[in-house]
């Protein structure tokens, strides 16, 4: 009788340990999900910022080209004089 009680107590302890481990892992999974969501949001924000910077860069390049064309035209006129 005491042998089976001992085995039962060991089994109960192992089951409790497994439950505790599962609970901790579930908590860790939730934390990782939250971190993943946060990082996904940061990636999205970074992509939007990059797109905005690319648009601004293209606009500035267009302006630079416009100024270069004007400068070339002015230099051409000066050579004529």
From Swiss-Prot:
Basic and acidic residues bias (residue ranges): 48-62
GO molecular function per UniProt: identical protein binding
Polar residues composition bias: residue spans: 37-47
Tell me the compartments it is located in: Cytoplasm
**Example of a GO cellular component annotation carried by this entry:** cell division site
Report the sequence similarity comment from the record: Belongs to the ZapB family.
Q: How does it assemble?
A: Homodimer. The ends of the coiled-coil dimer bind to each other, forming polymers. Interacts with FtsZ.
What is this protein for, i.e. what is its function? Answer: Non-essential, abundant cell division factor that is required for proper Z-ring formation. It is recruited early to the divisome by direct interaction with FtsZ, stimulating Z-ring assembly and thereby promoting cell division earlier in the cell cycle. Its recruitment to the Z-ring requires functional FtsA or ZipA.
- Output this protein's name: Cell division protein ZapB
